[in-house]
Amino acid sequence: TVDSFVIERWIRDRDVFVATARDLGAEVNVQDAGADAQEQISQIDYFIKKHMDVIVIIARDCGALSEAVERAHSAGIRVISYDRMVNDANTDMYISFDNRMVGEIMAQSMEEAIPDGGKIFMIQGSATDNNVAMVKEGFEDTLQGSNLQVVYEANCEGWTAELAVDYVEEALEEYPDVKGIMCGNDDIASQVIQVLAENQLAGQVIVVGQDGDLAACQRIVEGTQYMTAFKSIEDLARQAARYAVKMAEEGKVSSDVTDTVNDGSYD
């Protein structure tokens, strides 16, 4: 069950995951939650009724799915958190990137692009998403001791990129001399750049994002976005598919998975 296919990268994840799983002999049922947490809960319950072996979740709201995951576990179904950790749910596996490193790379790019320093905004993703906290940590730790100052922060709840419009407009009123904007992903960056363009600031304010979306790469060529942290989505999706199929076949987490991460209540 996928948060939404509005974000380009989830389409790429889906295509690679489905192709890999089918090559391994698995049947795959993909559901689009349409950016609706309640719909995603309904989809998980549907999968439970269909007696799926494994449910892979790209969470809409990382804090809203723990009871649904508990129902899946009670039915003997394994659950994987894919790139967004389901909080307080004790999912069987969490597979993602090194999100702290993503934040570090974004900060390093900012320092490179703004050598004279100045004010920057952080327009991040959902506050309930553990990845957002990790990216923020890496970003802020890297900026410590630099001449860049974070003067405005906001979170786009539910990863709703359109919320960035009001945030940036508000921030620009107070800090019109902003030098850079860190965006939670390229979808958010697209909204931020739209506001900058309306204020004749596109290309003058450094904008960084992540995901390597095609549109972001085009904006980099145009000069309105400075960088996007590229992540090998294909590798992540293939690996997740292999683990999901193996989990379905063996009924347990693969023995080569040894690292743990805390989801708020469980390791």
Regions found by a protein language model. Give the residues of each.
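Hydrophobic alpha-helical
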Residues: 45-49, 54-73, 139, 152, ...
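Hinge/beta->alpha junction and helix N-cap segments in small-molecule ligand-binding domains
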Residues: 1-15, 29-39, 60-61, 84, ...
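Short, hydrophobic alpha-helical segments
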Residues: 48, 110-115, 172, 240, ...
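Signal peptide-proximal N-terminal region
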Residues: 15-30, 145-147
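Extracellular/periplasmic ligand-binding modules, especially the Venus flytrap/periplasmic-binding
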Residues: 185-193, 221, 231-251
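Hydrophobic beta-strand scaffold residues
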Residues: 28, 76-79, 150
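Flexible loop/hinge segments that line or gate small-molecule binding clefts
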Residues: 62-101, 105, 112, 119, ...
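Hinge/cleft segment of the Venus flytrap/periplasmic-binding protein
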Residues: 127, 131, 141-143, 239-267
